[in-house]
Amino acid sequence: MSIEQSQLLAGKKGIIFGLANKKSIAWGIAQALKAQGASLAFTYLNEALEKRVRPLAEELGAELILECDVQNDQHIEKVFNQVEEAWGGLDFVVHSVAFADGADLKDRFHKTSRDGFKLALDILSLIHI
């Protein structure tokens, strides 16, 4: 049996933060997880991004598509509560969210502002389970 046919993640449920488009790392991860039988949930930041995320999530048969600003603790808590209510639990999280202030991208990395670095770090690493 090939790995493509093995369904290693059948019955497993996971949520993906950070899907933006078909060039996203999150898209490739989501496709691989779905191919292995996982049930998927996705998040989006706001209504504007929902218009891009929802069609992609639906293409992969997403069971949950939820709004979540990862800088907002109440949003994070609400998302995990919604997942708990719908699925009774969660097997994995994919955190593929990244952000940097445009002003900090205009110069060399070592010239990133302290506030810009804190913002990027906050967004990159704040999902806790």
Show which residues each predicted segment covers.
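Canonical Rossmann dinucleotide-binding motif of NAD(H)/NADP(H)-dependent dehydrogenases/reductases
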Residues: 6-42
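Conserved mid-core segment of classical short-chain dehydrogenase/reductases
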Residues: 57, 68, 72-77, 81-86, ...
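Conserved glycine-rich Rossmann-like NAD(P)H-binding loop of the short-chain dehydrogenase/reductase
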Residues: 36-54
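Conserved small/polar residues in nucleotide/adenosyl-binding loops
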Residues: 127-129
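Glycine/Thr-rich phosphate-binding loops of Rossmann-like dinucleotide-binding domains
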Residues: 24-25, 50, 101-104
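Local beta-strand N-terminus motif with an aromatic residue
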Residues: 62, 89-90, 117
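Conserved hydrophobic beta-strands of the Rossmann-like cofactor-binding core
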Residues: 13-15, 93-98
